[in-house]
Amino acid sequence: MTALPATSIAAPSLDDLDALNAHLETLRADERVAWALQHGPQQAALSSSFGAQSAVTLHLLTQQRPDIPVILIDTGYLFPETYRFADALTERLSLNLQVYRPLVSRAWMEARHGRLWEQGMVGIDQYNNLRKVEPMRRALDELNVGTWFTGLRRSQSGGRAQTPIVQKRGDRYKISPIADWTDRDVWQYLQAHALPYHPLWEQGYVSIGDFHTTRRWEPGMREEDTRFFGLKRECGIHEDI
């Protein structure tokens, strides 16, 4: 692997980021991870929804940094299968799991606002901010994360089609080492390392979030149609942070 000097990422200009992304596009995912762990600002952390294909990035990162903090946002509305999946992968991969939760319980939120996810786009956005965006922002701040790894892939939705491998968000670098992977790439990696899909994958769930805003994929649907009643794909974490 050809590594760029550390100063290339310490204070990059937009031109530097363009050149850096062009360079990283030529590397394998594991080489991108190695580069970012070496040259990115500390602390590094990985966020994971423990969704359909999350085992890939969890394995990819922990092969190189076993104790990397893994941030899970527990909205209080995850599928029971997701909690069990998180437990299983945490045990298998010896994850340094850091669970963050909203400041307000689900019961108190519903007492104040009702079922926000049933109140159109305005309600969904408010719900996502309360239960996902705020806890993630707090996690990144409290853990002093300088290099944030994600499992975003361009093929997941139209809104993610231009996802760069590295981008700067505020004072933080966001790294998506499998941004260019296809579903087949994911399948091959899982097979090669005997890693599981989420338990709901076999039931037709291709994108898995909260139980009340996730539905099975059906013929003719896009992956993004399975979330938030087809109104939107993103929960806000990768838009607002």
UniProtKB/Swiss-Prot annotation:
Q: What is its EC number?
A: 1.8.4.8
State where it is primarily located. Answer: cytoplasm
Name the GO terms of the biological process aspect.
Answer: hydrogen sulfide biosynthetic process; sulfate assimilation, phosphoadenylyl sulfate reduction by phosphoadenylyl-sulfate reductase (thioredoxin)
- Family designation: Belongs to the PAPS reductase family. CysH subfamily.
State what protein this is by name: Phosphoadenosine 5'-phosphosulfate reductase
The protein's annotated pathway: Sulfur metabolism; hydrogen sulfide biosynthesis; sulfite from sulfate: step 3/3
Q: Which GO terms describe its cellular component?
A: cytoplasm
Keywords (alphabetical) are: Cytoplasm, Oxidoreductase
Catalytic reaction(s) noted:
[thioredoxin]-disulfide + sulfite + adenosine 3',5'-bisphosphate + 2 H(+) = [thioredoxin]-dithiol + 3'-phosphoadenylyl sulfate
Give the residues annotated as active site.
235
Q: Can you tell which superkingdom this protein's organism belongs to?
A: Bacteria
Q: List the disulfide bonds.
A: none
Entry's Pfam families? PAPS_reduct
Q: What does this protein do?
A: Catalyzes the formation of sulfite from phosphoadenosine 5'-phosphosulfate (PAPS) using thioredoxin as an electron donor.
Which GO terms fall under molecular function for this chain's record? phosphoadenylyl-sulfate reductase (thioredoxin) activity
Q: Which InterPro entries match?
A: PAPS/APS_Rdtase, PAPS_reduct_dom, PAPS_reductase_CysH, Rossmann-like_a/b/a_fold
Give compartment(s). Answer: Cytoplasm
